[in-house]
């Protein structure tokens, strides 16, 4: 029996069956498949033939395929019986079933290192007693922001009498904690709106913001030190009004806070300060006044506390920021006679946003530190050290 061959409906050559809805040859079918979504679908005729039916340039050929009835929805995919890409089968490991990494698989989870207990009960009591008595001297200023600025000036870094850390251990770390917690309490006691709160709420706010305040204070003091001392080194940083040079600390003892080697603990702690250099450089460039710097301290602390606690505390901290923002506006308009201060304020807030970013982005690092028990510190008031980098 003689085989009947129908001509291709596109080019007229011998067909090879039905492709994408019409009788066509393999060449036209392959052309349609690779060209339907190509540039030829958007172009016009490439020749000047008057008879478009006899023209066979690529745009005209593709147009003819569509007009006669070729349908792109009839394309078929993944018909290969054997995949062209071999995916080797990976058998689950023992650690997958156990649910523990291999380097922890053979360790006894019931055996824990001896914790170092840090009792800050007396420190909290001392701050409570101070808040009961209020500031040591009467405060006279025209608004709330300038009252806070007076408190800030009393705690500025004395660059003329610089002391240097030659060793850092448990005593020095505890001293830093005590210094900043008491300093923040003395500073914020100059704020009338804060003194109107119940003492329990005052303590809760202080426990949340002291380490945020200390972070910007370290960067601001370091910037001030570099500005006043041309010989200052990039590795030098101000902590508790004492200069620490990471390259010249003769003795760094971390055995009391971790069972890991000192170099590993140091590297882990440095992850909490990845943006410090950029923050210091920004402060040097902006050179904020005491009033501007005070506003930056307050805005950063109250913004952090509001986002952390939400609810009633968020309303309180928003009110605090509104009061201080009005005072800052008065400072720009009246004291500095600067009506257009939007860009200046934007640049200041960029620094604060960078500090908040450093806190948020290092939370996964702190979580990993807790999982692998990098720190063996235990505090009497653990809520006081959330996001602080100490736990």
From Swiss-Prot:
Keyword Nucleus carried by entry: yes
Q: Which residues bind DNA?
A: 5-77
Membrane-crossing ranges are none
Q: Where in the cell is it found?
A: Nucleus
Q: Which GO terms describe its biological process?
A: innate immune response
According to UniProt, the name of this protein is: Nuclear hormone receptor family member nhr-115
Function of this protein?
Orphan nuclear receptor.
ZnF region ranges: NR C4-type: 8-28, 41-65
The terms under GO molecular function for this entry are: DNA-binding transcription factor activity; RNA polymerase II cis-regulatory region sequence-specific DNA binding; zinc ion binding
Cite the entry's keywords alphabetically.
Answer: DNA-binding, Metal-binding, Nucleus, Receptor, Transcription, Transcription regulation, Zinc, Zinc-finger
Does the keyword section mention Zinc-finger? yes
Q: Which Gene3D superfamilies match?
A: Erythroid Transcription Factor GATA-1, subunit A, Retinoid X Receptor
- SMART domains recorded for this chain? HOLI, ZnF_C4
Q: Which family does it belong to?
A: Belongs to the nuclear hormone receptor family.
Domain of life, source organism? Eukaryota
Domain NR LBD: start-end pairs: 130-388
């Amino acid at each position: 029996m003689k085989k009947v061959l129908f001509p291709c409906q596109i080019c007229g050559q011998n067909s090879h069956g039905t492709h994408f809805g019409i009788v066509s040859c393999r060449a036209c079918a392959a052309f349609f498949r690779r060209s339907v979504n190509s540039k030829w679908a958007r172009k016009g005729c490439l020749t000047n033939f008057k008879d478009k039916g006899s023209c066979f340039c690529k745009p005209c050929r593709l147009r003819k395929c569509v007009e006669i009835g070729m349908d792109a929805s009839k394309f078929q995919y993944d018909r290969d019986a054997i995949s062209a890409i071999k995916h080797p089968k990976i058998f689950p490991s023992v650690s997958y079933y156990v649910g523990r990494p291999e380097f922890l698989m053979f360790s006894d989870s019931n055996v824990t290192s001896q914790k170092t207990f840090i009792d800050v009960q007396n420190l909290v009591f001392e701050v409570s007693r101070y808040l009961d008595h209020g500031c040591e001297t009467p405060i006279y200023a025209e608004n709330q922001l300038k009252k806070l600025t007076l408190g800030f000036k009393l705690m500025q870094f004395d660059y003329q009498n610089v002391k240097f850390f030659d060793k850092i251990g448990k005593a020095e770390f505890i001293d830093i904690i005590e210094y900043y917690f008491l300093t923040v309490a003395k500073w914020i006691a100059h704020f009338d709106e804060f003194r109107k709160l119940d003492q329990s709420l005052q303590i809760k706010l202080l426990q949340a913001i002291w380490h945020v305040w200390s972070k910007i204070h370290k960067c601001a003091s370091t910037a001030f030190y570099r500005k006043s001392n041309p010989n200052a080194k990039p590795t030098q940083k101000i902590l508790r009004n004492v200069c620490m040079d990471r390259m010249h600390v003769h003795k760094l003892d971390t055995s009391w806070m971790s069972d890991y080697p000192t170099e590993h603990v140091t590297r882990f702690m440095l992850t909490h300060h990845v943006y410090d250099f950029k923050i210091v450089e920004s402060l040097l460039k902006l050179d904020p006044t005491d009033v501007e710097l005070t506003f930056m301290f307050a805005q950063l602390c109250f913004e952090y506390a509001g986002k952390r606690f939400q609810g009633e505390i968020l309303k309180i901290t928003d009110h605090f920021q509104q009061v201080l923002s009005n005072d800052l506006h008065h400072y720009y308009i009246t004291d500095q006679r600067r009506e257009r201060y939007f860009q200046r304020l934007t640049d200041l807030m960029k620094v604060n946003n960078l500090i908040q970013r450093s806190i948020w982005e290092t939370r996964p690092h702190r979580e990993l530190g807790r999982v692998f028990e990098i720190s063996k510190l235990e505090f009497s008031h653990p809520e006081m050290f959330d996001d602080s980098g100490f736990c």
